[in-house]
Amino acid sequence: MSRLEQRFAELKAEGRSALVTFVTAGDPGYDASLQILKGLPAAGADVIELGMPFTDPMADGVAIQLATLRALEAGQTLAKTLQMVREFRVDNHTTPIVLMGYYNPIHRFGVEKFVAEAKQAGVDGLIIVDLPPEHDAELATPAQAAGIDFIRLTTPTTDDARLPRVLERSSGFVYYVSVAGVTGAGSATTEHVTEAIARLRRHTDLPISVGFGIRTPEQAANIARLADGVVVGSALVDKIAQATSADQAVNDVLSLCSALAEGVRGARR
């Protein structure tokens, strides 16, 4: 059983949803980013998505584009992102880490080398937003062969004809993007999310995490009553953008994470 499978199974037994937090590796700088990463589990994050900075983040909204820019300007590379996971794993062997980003940096790094180093570092899953199922052989197949889950995005525009193809080789969990568009845009209604989850459950037994547009503990709680996981990214990244120092960035991100965790954990009581 993978770390992701284990975590979702534990939370299902507890009768609650997972808080899945997204931050960009290297934002606002390596040391502060590592502090945030190490602090998230104690602040209530059940699963961590760690963004791999890339110069052309086309699926991301302004908040995450700016986070990517800050990280790249601070010298973040894919090699440093993998090193960050290694350092995280020195003290934490239970919290799943999913790397999220685009295929280009991995392709340049070398797929075989990347998969081997990601596995060795302690990466549990990958979300590659610009690599559709038709290109499974390029990364999904070698990653899963190494024991790294490959997580697919589904959206309101993924119809019933397309869904089986998207979900066919998915593992870990399914990430439902509740609003069509870039990250951080709007938020979906409870009715919409309820219908979408019911539709996905007809096609897969994997846990379903819902993201995009969730910013407050109240919104997180609403989704936590419906989904197996609640993904929050832009709201956390905004705290880094608004901070006037690295220490403030760390404190503000972890404070918001704690508030979100409280919302998620109290949702089904």
UniProtKB/Swiss-Prot annotation:
Keywords: Amino-acid biosynthesis, Aromatic amino acid biosynthesis, Lyase, Tryptophan biosynthesis. It is an enzyme of class 4 (lyase). One of its GO terms (cellular component) is cytosol. It catalyses: (1S,2R)-1-C-(indol-3-yl)glycerol 3-phosphate + L-serine = D-glyceraldehyde 3-phosphate + L-tryptophan + H2O. It comes from the Bacteria. Its EC number is 4.2.1.20. The keyword Amino-acid biosynthesis applies. It holds the Pfam family Trp_syntA. The keyword Cytoplasm does not apply. Pathway: Amino-acid biosynthesis; L-tryptophan biosynthesis; L-tryptophan from chorismate: step 5/5. The active site is at E49 (proton acceptor), D60 (proton acceptor). The alpha subunit is responsible for the aldol cleavage of indoleglycerol phosphate to indole and glyceraldehyde 3-phosphate. Belongs to the TrpA family. Tetramer of two alpha and two beta chains. This is Tryptophan synthase alpha chain. It comes from Pseudomonas putida. The lineage of its organism: Bacteria, Pseudomonadati, Pseudomonadota, Gammaproteobacteria, Pseudomonadales.
